[in-house]
Amino acid sequence: MSTSDDIHNTTATGKCPFHQGGHDQSAGAGTTTRDWWPNQLRVDLLNQHSNRSNPLGEDFDYRKEFSKLDYYGLKKDLKALLTESQPWWPADWGSYAGLFIRMAWHGAGTYRSIDGRGGAGRGQQRFAPLNSWPDNVSLDKARRLLWPIKQKYGQKISWADLFILAGNVALENSGFRTFGFGAGREDVWEPDLDVNWGDEKAWLTHRHPEALAKAPLGATEMGLIYVNPEGPDHSGEPLSAAAAIRATFGNMGMNDEETVALIAGGHTLGKTHGAGPTSNVGPDPEAAPIEEQGLGWASTYGSGVGADAITSGLEVVWTQTPTQWSNYFFENLFKYEWVQTRSPAGAIQFEAVDAPEIIPDPFDPSKKRKPTMLVTDLTLRFDPEFEKISRRFLNDPQAFNEAFARAWFKLTHRDMGPKSRYIGPEVPKEDLIWQDPLPQPIYNPTEQDIIDLKFAIADSGLSVSERVSVAWASASTFRGGDKRGGANGARLALMPQRDWDVNAAAVRALPVLEKIQKESGKASLADIIVLAGVVGVEKAASAAGLSIHVPFAPGRVDARQDQTDIEMFELLEPIADGFRNYRARLDVSTTESLLIDKAQQLTLTAPEMTALVGGMRVLGANFDGSKNGVFTDRVGVLSNDFFVNLLDMRYEWKATDESKELFEGRDRETGEVKYTASRADLVFGSNSVLRAVAEVYASSDAHEKFVKDFVAAWVKVMNLDRFDLL
């Protein structure tokens, strides 16, 4: 019978022909636009984490809620939880300390300093892919163990903060003195889509360490936090793992001493789990059946838990006191000779061949075993540089304790931005260089001061383009991932930013603004730089016939060179900045994709990005003063000419060469070249989503709306790092 006959018969009997089974008829099912066009521009990344996904609503104030928290009562409850072993996931040696430390470590350890993404700041371990990574097996149990405490304290503590605090309490309850704890991590309610975890299509695909330097990746294998504990590509060779360890920890901003301290400290407590073959382990949480209720990796080996637990497949206990802090990791590492062996699951590990059975069994007090180590643990003994540090820690346990305390604090707070974002009673007083410290404000300009400064800037001889360019160069370094960069601190005037090619034109305005600062005697250069942008935008709007007030919040300060880690700030240098029509390299993605990347780092929406690009072009703010994308004969006037002329069908566009990076817009009738453009310009006419926004701003009634939207987005960027205004 034909399909039409089916429809006719079901209609005749009163049945809907589309409810008869067969195809998935649910929303979102079927072939998607990305299936048809896998290289489609990811404009959707700019719509992440909107209030529509937030069950707490846009008026929820986490800092305010946290202030109501019984902080030490929470820590007391966490301490009690550590030794309340649950039959559905029994605690090793009656303590969950090792499990909670691993949970915190693996939450924070996804951070990459190269792009500032990843890390523990949003509680992403709750969501895919991290909740189901091969390296995170059994951490679903750790998070579920925490649920009664999260339920008790509700919104006064975020999941993101709770994960890290649980790790801290686990260390403290094991006899270790931590460096401190800063809260302030706000939860999000869906997976981060912007993080590039790699392009591999299979878990645990090996990456060469050298490749990590060319991409924002933090691990040597897809699905690992750092390195393969069995050595590169399961080689079983401790020495060959050194390069991989340095690459991955280096991508987090850790030096050799911090790396050694973190590995040894993290492996002083707890154990790995490999009671039997990993083939007994079921699907991860994302793939597990609905009745598992978000848990995964159910094991059919024995009881599947406790002594029968399988996590990594490795079965390693490092120290004689796996629930109490000690220096046994280094003592065992150097005291014994190690022979390669395999775990019950078949994973490569090492055993101390000449050691007595001194390691307690986690569930049977009558049993002992020999010390065991991971392949990558032995790297700390056999790599010459790591060995020097390890022997120093062996002979000076206090130095090790201090190094681990600081490295752990850095690991767990690296993506939180400046210390001003930290809240809670245990925030350390010491300023640390990786926090990008700033001096305390000395003076806050009055309204009259601001008026006087604006007059001085207006009379300085700087053009609208120069004023806008210097302000943008200062503020646009901000990264929403780790909250680094921004205008506060005026680091545009310091190394390394003043020497970046992208800032060459912008820094030429600095002497003029520095003179104004000196003459004012009070205002910070950081405030004056941003105020220059205010004056430029207001003048450009006035030239367009609109009287616009650009909001300005004073209170920025000027950082010193000794407060600026040059190596770490080099990572903020843009590969591309489509807002300024800048691109340094052509071997990394497409120009339009890098524009989206930059906009996402600046936490912009698609309309905000569109308004800013259109405004920057007509204000003549290209990094090199080029005319690319300057679709106007009124440069310096805040008009919507960029959109009007981009969408004008009088012009056709042709690439100037085979690279298709630059284009000429020719009059269709005369063939005359009217405009030139980059891909960062033409994307607003090419991409269907961005064109829809551009059409709004190109409309005859949209000029005032465009100016207001540009100003709002501009002020947002200028204030991205003003955490003192929260």
Swiss-Prot record:
The record marks R102 as: Transition state stabilizer. It catalyses: H2O2 + AH2 = A + 2 H2O; 2 H2O2 = O2 + 2 H2O. There is a cross-link at Y226-M252 (Tryptophyl-tyrosyl-methioninium (Tyr-Met) (with W-105)). Heme b binds at H267. The active site is at H106. It holds the Pfam family peroxidase. InterPro entries: Catalase_peroxidase, Haem_peroxidase, Haem_peroxidase_sf, Peroxidases_AS, Peroxidases_heam-ligand_BS. One of its GO terms (cellular component) is cytosol. One of its GO terms (biological process) is hydrogen peroxide catabolic process. Formation of the three residue Trp-Tyr-Met cross-link is important for the catalase, but not the peroxidase activity of the enzyme. It comes from the Bacteria. Signal peptide: none annotated. Binds 1 heme b (iron(II)-protoporphyrin IX) group per dimer. Its cofactor is heme b. Its EC number is 1.11.1.21. It is an enzyme of class 1 (oxidoreductase). Residues 1-33 are annotated as: Disordered. Keywords: Heme, Hydrogen peroxide, Iron, Metal-binding, Oxidoreductase, Peroxidase. There is a cross-link at W105-Y226 (Tryptophyl-tyrosyl-methioninium (Trp-Tyr) (with M-252)). Belongs to the peroxidase family. Peroxidase/catalase subfamily. Bifunctional enzyme with both catalase and broad-spectrum peroxidase activity. HAMAP family: Catal_peroxid. Homodimer or homotetramer. This is Catalase-peroxidase.
